[in-house]
Amino acid sequence: MSKQYVLDSWALLALLQGEEPAAARVKEILLEGERQQAALLISIVNLGEVYYRVGRRSSRATAVDTLNQIRSLSLTIISASDEMMLAAADLKLEYAISYADAFAAALADHTGATLVSGDPEFDQLQSRIKVEKLHRTLK
């Protein structure tokens, strides 16, 4: 498999909330993963971010259901190892990004994968990692 994507929480939240055109692109990427045309990765830290954001908007029960749905996807969840923690912390030292975003960026940097997000914090990292910038229509 030559294509690899790291999904940031922004991408999954856009899908869950039906924010187009980002949601359609995330669906396409997930389909590529299901068809084994691409490897799909997410940091456990970013998965936790999806969980708490869904829980805040809805309920803990909805967040648990969402987490179970995400775990059923063709998506490899990467733990926060010492190596990833240090890589994320080094990115946080160098760039003005959130700590959770630093984990997504560190994973993309480590694997050479394309980071999929609409978060503008990643704009400053485009010389270092590949970023597929998602967009949503403003309401």
Annotate the PLM regions.
Residues 1-42, 55-68, 138-139:
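Short, well-structured N-terminal submotif of metal-dependent ribonuclease cores
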Residues 2-4, 105-139:
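Acidic, PIN/NYN-like endoribonuclease modules and their adjacent C-terminal/linker elements
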Residues 8, 101, 119:
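Acidic active-site catalytic centers that drive phospho-/nucleotidyl reactions
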Residues 12, 47, 122-123:
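A generic structural signal for short hydrophobic patches within well-formed alpha-helices
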Residues 34, 71, 109:
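Anion (oxyanion) recognition and catalysis
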Residues 53-54, 74:
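Helix-loop "lid/cap" segments that line or gate small-molecule binding pockets
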Residues 76-116:
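Active-site neighborhoods of divalent-metal-dependent phosphate/nucleic-acid chemistry enzymes
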